[in-house]
């Protein structure tokens, strides 16, 4: 993750919150604790703090229009896509944050595939931040988070629920959650999968890396 001088206040604010929660005296004490921690807790906490989690449903909508108008028809007519009589489709949301992107993928696929039962669809959602991965698995979003979605789609793909504070919220329907597998993953470690993906969404994580790192990741995605 590339952290320039323009991110200093962001980093200071996020670590300041952790220091207060741990009732530490300041950054020096926190740094000393990081150096002596052998459990891995410090590293996970640091990664969760500095990974930015800006996301929303149907963010960068052009990508989902491309899925509907180009990707789905291309996969459908590919003979190699059929396995066991079904059309195989695999997608990956790399840097999935709290899951809005991958659930938007699911909704887009269901809205634009006429006979979904004839498809074998599996979506992978990964992120370095363990907290947002857990959020995505739960699939619960505040009314504010879903406010940009068409009411007809909310009714079709969400159930009324409550958030962790007991406030009215929405939860993705079970059939959407079953399409997605959430996993904690560091993009710079070994990837625990070998099968090819038909599409990868990675913009939301790539923008936080410098150019050489971006080029290295693009080559890995391609391979």
Please describe what each predicted stretch is.
Residues 1-92:
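Conserved AdoMet
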Residues 17, 36, 73, 111, ...:
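Active-site micro-motifs of SAM-dependent methyltransferase domains
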Residues 68, 106-110, 222:
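A structural alpha-helix within SAM-dependent methyltransferase catalytic domains
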Residues 71, 75, 109-113, 140:
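Active-site catalytic pocket residues across diverse enzymes, especially alpha/beta-hydrolases
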Residues 84-104, 118-124:
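Conserved class I S-adenosyl-L-methionine
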Residues 94, 114-201, 205-213:
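Extended basic-aromatic, gly/pro-enriched interface segments that bind polyanionic ligands
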Residues 215-223:
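A short glycine-rich, Lys/Arg-flanked "PGG" loop and its adjoining helix->strand segment in the class I
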